[in-house]
Amino acid sequence: MKEFVISETKVETAVIVGLITPQQNERKTTEYLNELEFLADTAGAKVVRRFTQRVNGPSSVTYIGSGKLEEIAAFLKQKEDEEDPVGMVIFDDELSAKQIRNIEKALQVKILDRTSLILDIFAMRAQTAAAKTQVELAQYRYMLPRLTRLWTHLERQRGGSVGLRGPGETQLEMDQRIIR
């Protein structure tokens, strides 16, 4: 007789972040955050808090202002001691590689933006080989511009013996070549 084991998948908790700008009023931001929360739920995450900030436009460094970043960090620190700490922060916009890196450095949790969340959902739901390939291609296209400065700790790879080749290629160049 077969035994069935019911495994409980741990739901990852998340907070979501959106901006209220002159181009996007509070009502519209709330609608977008409702949709983002639904997407997070679809991906298997439970949203425990929303953060919004009223600004003229996103910061090129961290998307949100430093004060709001500190507020989110304090909330994450508070939740750290609880049974269910927050594992990710999801932003309701597309973030640059620089913004993701700076936010991850400040908050010490996984950072996602709307596009990466949607791609994750597609990857989870893809059934056929063709669908899986299309999703993987879309993920690579999304990742390609974000590779810059992810490998700053690595210098150029060795090129070969002196006089035969140049200094070699960087890890970034290798990753870009592989993805293409």
Q: Where are the language model's segments positioned?
A:
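N-terminal accessory targeting/assembly segments
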Residues: M1-R114, I118
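Extended, highly charged alpha-helical segments
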Residues: A106, L117-R180
